Amino acid sequence: MAKAVWNGQTLAESETFETVEGNIYFPDESVKREFFRSSSTTSSCPWKGQARYYTVFVDGQENPDAAWYYPDPKPAARAVKHHIAFWRGVEVTP
């Protein structure tokens, strides 16, 4: 089971996930949305497409752009559609 934890709070947990370039992507339904707020940050990957970000909020602390997703991934990255990945201090274990 994969798990994402930040500031002592489980943000996502799932037995099913996708691993791309060493990052674990959690299915949307496994993510605790109450800890996420949309960010205006975007980035672009030549083979995955345009990423969007979430800022994570736990116990009054924020972790800007700590989660990302591809709302409309390119065909080669179709497996990560409806999935979210983490970085910036979020501990992810497979």
Model-derived features: where do they sit?
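Terminal leader/tail segments of proteins
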Residues: 1-94
